[in-house]
């Protein structure tokens, strides 16, 4: 298992996203511009570190000379999420499901195994795979994947305008609403539910 720093993971994710969207890797200058580096040389140093760790392969003499070894196709299936690390960090990915990202709309960036029956009344059951579009831009009523104090949960999002409190509603009367005070809770929206896959 490759251990990457947060910055290295960010660059690797950028390379993967760029290849998925355009079919080819970004240049050093593009990486520097997107991530706010002062020069392409700074991006080059990070790329060399990634290559030393085996996360990428570099092809000399080509401006887009970056290759991902053993590129996996399909949507990553995320397992247990470690505290303080990005949800799509390599160590969280258990497998890849052979489904095109654009099978869902908006596209699914990852799959998450549902644990529990708190959302059963809208057909999200224990053991299902939830297709998730990675974004923190959600609206009232959306089904979201949220992280609270490093626990990941699937709930319906509600927030009143100008209030520092978020409510995460279950779709099962046996479960309680989770209230989160944004001023003191370690809270983040990890993504928006875009579909469910039932395991047979």
From Swiss-Prot:
Residues of the site described as Cleavage: 83-84
Enzyme class: hydrolase
Keyword Transmembrane on entry: no
Coiled-coil stretches noted in the UniProt entry, renumbered to this chain: none
InterPro entries assigned to the protein according to its UniProt record, in alphabetical order: LexA, LexA-like, LexA/Signal_pep-like_sf, LexA_DNA-bd_dom, LexA_repressor, Peptidase_S24_LexA, Peptidase_S24_S26A/B/C, WH-like_DNA-bd_sf
Catalytic activity: Hydrolysis of Ala-|-Gly bond in repressor LexA
GO molecular-function terms, A-Z: DNA binding; serine-type endopeptidase activity
GO terms for biological process, alphabetical: DNA repair; DNA replication; negative regulation of DNA-templated transcription; proteolysis; SOS response
SUPFAM superfamilies reported for this sequence: LexA/Signal peptidase (SSF51306), Winged helix' DNA-binding domain (SSF46785)
Subunit record text: Homodimer.
Family, similarity comment: Belongs to the peptidase S24 family.
Known role: Represses a number of genes involved in the response to DNA damage (SOS response), including recA and lexA. In the presence of single-stranded DNA, RecA interacts with LexA causing an autocatalytic cleavage which disrupts the DNA-binding part of LexA, leading to derepression of the SOS regulon and eventually DNA repair.
Protein name per its UniProtKB record: LexA repressor
Gene responsible for this protein: lexA
């Amino acid at each position: 298992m490759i251990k990457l720093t947060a910055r290295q993971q960010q660059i690797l994710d950028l390379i993967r996203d760029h290849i998925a969207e355009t079919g080819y890797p970004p240049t050093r200058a593009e990486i520097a511009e997107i991530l706010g580096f002062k020069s392409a040389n700074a991006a080059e140093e990070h790329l060399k570190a990634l290559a030393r760790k085996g996360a990428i392969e570099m092809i000399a003499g080509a401006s887009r000379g970056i290759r991902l070894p053993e590129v996996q196709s399909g949507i990553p299936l995320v397992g247990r999420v470690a505290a303080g690390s990005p949800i799509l960090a390599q160590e969280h990915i258990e497998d890849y499901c052979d489904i095109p990202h654009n099978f869902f709309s908006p596209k699914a960036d990852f799959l998450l195994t549902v644990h529990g029956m708190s959302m059963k009344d809208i057909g999200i059951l224990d053991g299902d795979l939830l297709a998730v579009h990675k974004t923190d831009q959600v609206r009232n009523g959306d089904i979201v994947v949220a992280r609270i104090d490093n626990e990941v949960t699937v709930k319906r999002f509600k927030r009143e305008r100008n209030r520092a409190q978020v409510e995460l509603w279950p779709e099962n009367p046996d479960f309680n609403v989770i209230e989160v005070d944004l001023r003191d809770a370690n809270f983040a929206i990890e993504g928006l539910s875009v579909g469910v896959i039932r395991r047979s």
